[in-house]
């Protein structure tokens, strides 16, 4: 008979995964629901993006179409607002909200919004940390030497950089949504009742980032529990 070992800290990973799944399902459901509601302005996502950028005095950012669903993003390296299939040509209140949100990031970039600058600086560090954290920690756990504790701490620090990136992302996303709603209202693109629906779409999207941050914190907590348990055993 095989021997099976259950690590109780796995529950933290499971909780994080469930939170992310619920948030993802909610944003998809909310977007699909309000994708059926056409805006009274009749403008599509690309037109709204151009309108918002011009209203913000930004003329060096291009609006592009990208394939996929909900793959919308702003790329500060190429200064492009990239809108996906359900947004670029769509006229729904959901699509216009997403388009304006991505323009919110372009406005942040143009105004040197501090949290966005910090997040951009953290990207290579977070990628490096998330890739090497576990290998470094495993080396520290497997090789019982005087420097094992230091190696483990380095691994935890590397993973903490990835967690920090997730946390810094939160104010960036919330602020982009705030800027989007202000632009949609002041430019007369959406009526007040339409803004209420768009706010729901953007709020559900923001919750996915909250879920990702929570999951990252839970994974970090698991790492700390595992390594502390090993240290006590030693």
Question: Which residues does each PLM region occupy?
Answer:
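Post-HExxH zinc-binding segment in Zn-dependent metallohydrolases
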Residues: 123-148
């Amino acid at each position: 008979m095989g021997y099976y070992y259950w690590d109780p800290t796995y529950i933290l990973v499971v909780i994080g995964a469930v939170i992310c799944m619920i948030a993802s399902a909610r944003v998809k459901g909310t977007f699909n629901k309000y994708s059926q509601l056409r805006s009274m302005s009749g403008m599509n996502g690309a037109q709204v993006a151009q309108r918002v950028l011009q209203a913000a005095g930004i003329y060096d950012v291009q609006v592009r179409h990208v394939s996929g669903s909900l793959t919308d993003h702003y790329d500060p390296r190429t200064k492009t607002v990239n809108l996906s299939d359900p947004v670029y040509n769509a006229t729904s209140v959901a699509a216009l909200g997403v388009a304006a949100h991505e323009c919110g990031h372009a406005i942040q970039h143009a105004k040197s919004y501090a949290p966005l600058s910090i997040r951009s600086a953290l990207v290579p560090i977070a990628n490096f940390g998330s890739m090497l954290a576990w290998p470094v920690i495993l080396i520290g756990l497997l090789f019982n030497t005087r420097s094992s504790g230091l190696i483990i701490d380095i691994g935890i620090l590397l993973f903490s950089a990835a967690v920090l990136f997730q946390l810094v992302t939160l104010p960036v996303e919330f602020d982009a949504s705030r800027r989007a709603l202000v632009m949609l209202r002041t430019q007369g693109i959406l009526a007040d009742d339409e803004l209420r629906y768009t706010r729901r779409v953007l709020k559900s999207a923001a919750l996915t980032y909250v879920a990702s941050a929570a999951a990252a914190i839970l994974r970090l907590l698991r790492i700390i529990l595992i390594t502390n348990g090993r240290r006590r055993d030693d």
